[in-house]
């Protein structure tokens, strides 16, 4: 399963993990020294959000910061004619509203 938000497109990013030793100057030491830098990944906080649209249950995988946007989409979809469509087609129509 992909680690990408379906609404915002947030995806994992690469960041550095820095290991240090020593005492900080502000605490009376000679300063921190870097002893190692390694790559790490930071993942978006993806959550599954299930909503009911046109009698169908649809699941979105979205970042936690965009959960309210899903409910906004559902409100906007009330004027659309979505009856008779499959859940996948309904989801596609909702994402077009963005």
Curated annotation (Swiss-Prot):
GO MF entry, a single one: structural constituent of ribosome
Coiled-coil portions: none
SS bond partners: none
Keywords annotated in UniProt: Ribonucleoprotein, Ribosomal protein
Keyword GTP-binding: no
GO biological process: translation
Family: Belongs to the bacterial ribosomal protein bL28 family.
Subunit structure, as described in the record: Part of the 50S ribosomal subunit.
Protein name: Large ribosomal subunit protein bL28
Protein species of origin: Thermus thermophilus (strain ATCC 27634 / DSM 579 / HB8)
Lineage: Bacteria, Thermotogati, Deinococcota, Deinococci, Thermales
